[in-house]
């Protein structure tokens, strides 16, 4: 809801839901909580300086198993924050990001097992902060083209068999990858 510049975050509750958002323009905000066990979401953004902040089951009520989320954007200086489930309850989640533009920031905190997180990012000065936790078999793949990037990737599971791949083409940047399958602490 938006009235004269004021914004109220949405709150969607239910066992299973499908949400399709097509947002066009600059300086928009898409903020809210989703409480559902299975979410199918298509989020398309075309514009600059937009903000996307979503929490899926932040109170650990339903989980977020079998969710299929697609985030696509064309534009620059956008900020994306996604917190998906707690306690590895986003089992078999399929999360796909396609980002085209410069100076975009993705901050994703995903608690999953047997789930995938694929990011395809094209543009300069983009930042990715990914924290993937869960029991086992988390799959993270980042395919990036562009200069001056910043990646901070943490993937930790209780058991093992996680998979992580980063392919990046361009000049300059900072990359920190920590992967730990229940063993010793790691750091950059």
Task: Describe every region a protein language model picked out.
Residues 1-188:
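Low-complexity repeat regions of mature extracellularly deployed or surface/particle-associated proteins
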